Design a protein with these regions (language model features):
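Sec-dependent bacterial lipoprotein signal peptides
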Residues: 2-35
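Acidic, polar-rich low-complexity tracts and alpha-helical solenoid repeat scaffolds
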Residues: 2-5, 31-299
Length: 299
């Protein structure tokens, strides 16, 4: 009886393993069969057949294979009835693989080749979105961010009534926030460097000012001017006030009063725009110290 039970357990275990082996074998067979079929298609000279195969692969979500075939036929199909579709599909194949730079290149190629094509609106939109998805973090070079903004703005100009206009505008706002963050980080770096001479700003005659606060002020002011509706406006404004005050404290005597007065003016501007700021205690302290210095100077 004991051996009978053990035999049944062994038989069941063996059957389970065999089932798994069969499933794996079937999957592997299908995979190699699919690879073999694709390699055969690559060797075909019939570009129409390759195009139909590419459409089939694309429809099944096999974008890498679709792209490989479309790369071979897209130039041949240019000027034919399938020219537009093949080029747009190639761009989408790369887009769906998250190869956004290549995708944007082909979307751009499409709308320049077919400015009134049936996919032109989608091509312009996806070209901008592809560049948007590829933009780097704020600390890095933002050249691609400017390019993405330009592409999305062009989309909105060409298709002002598009259903995708709102999404395009939101992407532009997001990209602008990234540029603001870049400026903010630069301004903050200048502020933190302070009087470090190795990276100090200079006067018109080439003399070292002995601080980086002027560079911080200029960078912060430009950010507020270029992006007046940024969500980081308060953070940039407090940095600007701090820099003006520190510039005043570090200035030579003949410039100190003027710069302290500029810090006081900045205080009023900050209080007017952010009356309930979380930095209220700090800005009041800056105002008190700057005012005290100016008062003592004129007593």
């Amino acid at each position: 009886m004991y051996y009978s039970v053990e035999r049944r357990k062994f038989a069941q275990l063996f059957l389970n393993k065999m089932k798994k082996f069969i499933v794996i074998a079937l999957i592997a067979g299908a995979f190699f069969s699919s690879c073999g079929e694709f390699n055969k298609i690559l060797k075909y000279a019939d570009y129409e057949y390759k195009y139909e195969a590419a459409k089939s692969y694309f429809g099944n979500g096999q974008y890498a294979k679709a792209a490989s075939l479309l790369e071979e036929v897209v130039t041949i199909l240019k000027g034919t009835g399938n020219g537009e579709e093949s080029l747009y599909m190639l761009a989408m194949a790369y887009y769906n693989q998250k190869d956004y730079i290549t995708a944007s290149h082909y979307f751009s190629n499409y709308y320049n080749t077919y400015p009134r094509g049936i996919y032109t609106e989608l091509a312009r939109y996806h070209s901008g979105k592809a560049l948007f998805l590829e933009t780097p973090e704020p600390r890095l070079d933002q050249s691609s961010t400017y390019k993405a903004i330009q592409e999305l703005q062009m989309f909105m100009e060409y298709f002002p009534n598009s259903d995708r206009k709102t999404e395009a505008q939101l992407m532009i706002f997001s990209l602008q926030d990234k540029l603001v963050m870049k400026d903010y980080l630069s301004a903050k770096l200048y502020y933190n460097l302070g009087t470090y001479i190795g990276n100090a700003s200079t006067t018109a005659d080439g003399k070292i000012n002995g601080n980086n606060y002027l560079a911080c002020i200029t960078t912060a002011q430009n950010a507020l001017k270029d992006y007046p509706y940024t969500t980081m406006r308060e953070e940039i404004s407090i940095l600007l006030l701090r820099a003006k005050y520190k510039l005043g404290t570090e200035s030579v005597e003949e410039k100190k009063e003027e710069r302290m007065r500029e810090a006081i003016d900045e205080y009023y501007a900050f209080k007017n725009e952010f009356p309930e700021s979380k930095y209220t205690k700090e800005v009041e302290s800056i105002y008190k110290n700057a005012s005290k210095y100016v008062k003592e100077l004129n007593d």
